[in-house]
Amino acid sequence: MAALNMVRKGLFGELLHATCGYEHDLRDVKFNDGKHYTYQKGGELRMGKDAFAEAQWRTNHSVRRNGDVYPTHGIGPVANCLDINRGNRFLSLSAMATQSRGLHKFIVDNGGENHPLAKVRFNLGDIVTSMIKCANGQTVIVTHDTNSPRPYSLGFRIQGTEGLWMNDGDHVYVENQSKPHRWDDSEEWFKKFDHTLWSKHEAEAAQAGHGGMDYVMMFDLINAIHNKKPAPMDCYDAAAWSAISALSEMSI
């Protein structure tokens, strides 16, 4: 939200480019037996109706599909920064996928080559990259990466004619304010540009899920309904963000 505030106040100049995605090691989630995570002693590899929670349905997407199966998590905040459906729009998309290796390797490493799931043919590329062109000229790169060993990241980068912010490493650079060719730590910038919604409700939000995001999003929606204002996200946003999934499959 602080980064959005920086954009709104013109800190980065005219926006040129953004990156985002869903980069989250979900291999254990995709084969969860409901009793143990598979890397723990005694865990079993399961998927489908005999599995637990997301492993009942999520893993099947990796079998049937090859595209960005979850673009909305990352593209939402970027779309807000780029004024998508509010003076700007997505124009075109081109996507590509790597080979599919991670899930099969995970099964073999944890269950052996003779495990029944080792026969499953996974279609989803381990890393799917979609490039989007916007009507106002900007480009966006969206990455889906859930079958690889890695720390969690949404890969945010917002870049303009006068600077940029990257969430990996918490970096900010602003021309004529940062030291030349040296990153600033984002903490001081975030304090300066803290969003009023966050600063006002930070204490309450801290008790909610996903680092406070759940609280802020629900508060913003309920506040809009209560005051009869436009919702912060609407059905047109949902359609634009979700279309990336189907279009990436068509492109690949």
Where would I find each of the regions flagged by the language model?
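Short glycine/serine/proline-enriched coil/turn segments at secondary-structure junctions
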Residues: L26-D28, S148-P151, M166
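C-terminal glycine/acidic-rich active-site capping loop/insertion
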Residues: G42, Q99-G125, T129, K133-C134, ...
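Glycine-rich phosphate/pyrophosphate-binding beta-alpha loops
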Residues: L124, T143-Y152
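Predominantly a Rossmann-like dinucleotide-binding segment in NAD(P)-dependent oxidoreductases
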Residues: M1-R121, L221
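A contiguous, mid-protein "functional segment" used to position or interact
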Residues: D234-I252
